[in-house]
Amino acid sequence: FIVGGPVGDFELLLCHGTVCVVGKMRDLILQLSKSSIYSTKPGESKKRGRGPTSPGPLASLLDRPLSELTPENIAEWLSTERQNRPTVTAHAYRLLRAFIKWANYQKKYQGIIHGDLAQDHNVRKMVPISASKAGDCLQKEQLKSWFSAVRSLNNPIASAYLQVLLLTGARREEISSLRWSDIDFKWSSMRIKDKIEGERIIPLTPYVSDLLRSLMEIPNRGTNEENWVFRSNSKSGKIIEPCSAHNRALTRAELPHISLHGLRRSFGTLAEWVEVPTGIVAQIMGHKPSALAEKHYRRRPLDLLRKWHEKVELWILEEAKIKNNVDKR
């Protein structure tokens, strides 16, 4: 027998006691990852460039019924994929683990996959260790070249996005998901959707404020139905993949590769030059409290965060030789 029905955004079929995802696991994995690179099948046309795509790390699992997701199969899959792309495989495993947890929360499908499958010892020992790349951080002597190249980008939205990313230390998704309703120009604050606390309020520093005001002046901003600050022509309407713009800027500035997460890392590192208290930096960046006192006894007001955040911004701009905050693209 076959029973079909919608579960969230996903169509599932119950086939002889096993769950098979229509479109396989693809739709759910895409919803979780916001990117097709993990589940792309081989032979599909590339969205950028020419030629067919290579299979994503999850592609070999997409056609399996869930009942076949056993520790042995997952361990074998990890063993194969980790050989050529360990970091991407580790991320794909985390997406798969999230999928398994989701499936086990649905009453209709509980018991089809063992809930502790992803925690099996033989599976866990095959998961590649993700380590941050050495040097994935801007040095203070590189700031002038970086800002010059980023501000020269033809796309003002990508240019502003990259600068805001560096000057707030926020996660890339937190900044790309900003709506204009999250920006308070009157009280100089930004509301950020935080994966740790749900949301956090951080200062809207002077230079970042000017950057965002300049985006409001871009023509056709009214066509942005979702009210995204950093809009694009993508299906979601917001900026999704700014890496290409950043890579062009790095090439122009003759700087080594720095990831978008490296810009977040740069904020935390550069803040040490101004001797910002560690707890202040952590609260601005949205890190978990690392000590008992931080967790239970520190409730810093926005003005205190602003005092230090503006010092960091001013120091970075001075090192970048940007003397006038209004002097920008």
Predicted regions and their residues:
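Basic/aromatic-enriched alpha-helical hairpins
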Residues: F1, G17-R85, K101
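Extreme N-terminal basic, low-complexity initiation segments
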Residues: I2-L12
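Catalytic-site neighborhood detector that most strongly recognizes the C-terminal catalytic loop/helix
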Residues: C137, R191-E197, M285-W315
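Short basic/aromatic active-site micro-motif
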Residues: L69, I157-A158, P256-V274
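Short, polar N-cap/turn motifs at the start of nucleic acid-interacting alpha helices
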Residues: D182-S189, H257, V276-H296, E318-K328
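C-terminal secondary-structure termini that scaffold catalytic or DNA-interacting sites
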Residues: E11, H16, S214-N224, R231-S236, ...
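Basic, Lys/Arg- and aromatic-enriched nucleic-acid-binding interface segment
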Residues: E81-L95, Y105-R172, S176-S177, K186, ...
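Active-site/catalytic core of tyrosine-dependent DNA strand-transfer enzymes
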Residues: C137-K144, W187, T205-P256
